[in-house]
From Swiss-Prot:
It is found in: Plastid. GO terms for biological process: translation. Its main location: plastid. Keywords: Plastid, Ribonucleoprotein, Ribosomal protein. One of its GO terms (molecular function) is structural constituent of ribosome. It comes from Prototheca wickerhamii. This is Large ribosomal subunit protein bL32c. Belongs to the bacterial ribosomal protein bL32 family. The keyword Cell wall biogenesis/degradation does not apply.
Length: 47
């Protein structure tokens, strides 16, 4: 017979969520830095 799983605590859920958000923030920061570099190179190439 199927038994419902125990509910994940709010603190554990928030911990995992904050971890995911922190990693996403780092990735977004890297992507933005790379985009800025590419844009600078393209602008300097024209001059």
């Amino acid at each position: 017979m199927a038994v419902p799983k125990k509910r994940t605590s709010k603190s554990k859920k928030n911990l995992r969520k904050s971890q995911w958000k922190a990693q996403a923030f780092v990735q977004a920061k890297k992507a933005l830095a790379k985009a800025k570099t590419v844009l600078k190179l393209l602008l300097n190439k024209d001059n």
